Amino acid sequence: MFGDYCLFNSYIGFGSKYGQLFMTLAPPIAGITGWLFLGEEMRWTSWLAMFVTLSGIAFSIMVKQGNSVKVKLPLKGILFGIGAGMGQGVGLVLSKIGLEHYAMSIPEDAPKSVVMLMPFAGTYIRALAGLVGFTIILLCRKEMGQVWQGLHNKQGMTYATLTTFFGPFVGVSLSLMAVQYTHAGIASTLMALTPVLIILPYSIIHKQKVSVRELIGTIITLTGVAMFFLI
């Protein structure tokens, strides 16, 4: 819930292109979380890779104005972006731990399909937790009325339904299936390809040119992510 809340607020701050760039923080955070909770090794190359990743993000979001360098994105959005990456990284490791405990409780004579469906069960649990959490937030902020108004917006509900299907259902379920069969860090690294995959459709839909600086920054960031688990 924390990661999604931060991610959607970062989208409001500076759009999905930069929001997904900050999500590349998830693999390093997943590595650190695995080190803390699972006792996985953190070598000096891992810290170097983290520095490269952060350098790539900084290169993308900063712009030179005269003799000074300034951040071209709002601070609030940056903080939400960092929170989104942290939430995704920590959540992925905790999900892996939960799936492992769940797998241990399955009887040996259970059908293999039960194991295959575990990621979808995990997604269902995460969705319920998110529903409860966001409902509490909306009630505390007295914004439930806006939710009911949004339900009558046919275009908005159409996009929301498609987003729910491809995001929480397909995307999250496959991500949990990935961590079920491989290390959380490796799975998170592959999922960090989103900033590259989103460049072309984002530029077409929003009719915005992608600057060389943004492209170079994205490449540097993904290089750092790859270094984190491949060196």
Task: Label each region the model flagged.
Residues 28-86, 90, 96, 203, ...:
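Juxtamembrane helix-loop boundary signature in multi-pass membrane transporters
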Residues 4-14, 55, 62-82, 86, ...:
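Membrane-interface interhelical linkers
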Residues 7-8, 19, 34, 92-96, ...:
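Interfacial helix-capping/hinge residues at the ends of transmembrane alpha-helices
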Residues 88-108:
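Membrane-helix interface motif
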Residues 18-21, 44, 121-124, 186-189, ...:
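Signature of the 12-TM Major Facilitator Superfamily
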Residues 7-26, 33-42:
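Membrane-interface helix-loop-helix junctions at boundaries between adjacent transmembrane segments
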Residues 26, 84-88, 163-168, 194:
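Alpha-helical transmembrane segments of multi-pass membrane transport proteins
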Residues 22-36, 51, 129, 133, ...:
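Alpha-helical transmembrane segments of compact multi-pass small-molecule transporters, enriched
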